[in-house]
């Protein structure tokens, strides 16, 4: 595990911080590392990270209406009623530890609805850059961070974006379920993947 961290994290200071947080997480009931090799970051660990620097959390949208037998909220391209409940539950837990953040989503009905139910009234900014994912997603994240360098950022996006980031940054195979997330941060103009967000 130590060798993996040393090869993945270029900042000595951040390496020490993440090791300490992983050790703290390991004392709990959940493993500190996911089976895909990504560190597991729960709400409390995320709050500690946010004390060190602003965090960027990317979530996959909630349950899609067009791929479920559950009742749709409204538009068939949006999310289900169950999806709204799951997003609200996640948002309540998240906001209890990270109350201050800027909120973004891609320009699809399902991500907009997910972000709206997650935030319970927080201002949402729709940004089409979070629909198509490749290296350009890092430029978009850095752009948001430059505009508000001291703010945490939450982005609702899509499974292919999260899969791309995990593979590109840590060579990890990540197949996110609805509302699964990744935790990142920007340091000295570079975007780093810290781990997988787990809502426990």
UniProtKB/Swiss-Prot annotation:
Its EC number is 3.1.3.-. It is an enzyme of class 3 (hydrolase). Pathway: Bacterial outer membrane biogenesis; lipopolysaccharide metabolism. The keyword DNA-binding does not apply. SUPFAM superfamilies: Phosphoglycerate mutase-like. InterPro entries: His_Pase_superF_clade-1, His_PPase_superfam, LipoPS_heptP_Pase. Its main location: periplasm. GO terms for molecular function: phosphatase activity. Belongs to the phosphoglycerate mutase family. Ais subfamily. Catalyzes the dephosphorylation of heptose(II) of the outer membrane lipopolysaccharide core. This is Lipopolysaccharide core heptose(II)-phosphate phosphatase. It comes from Escherichia coli O6:K15:H31 (strain 536 / UPEC). The lineage of its organism: Bacteria, Pseudomonadati, Pseudomonadota, Gammaproteobacteria, Enterobacterales. The gene is ais.
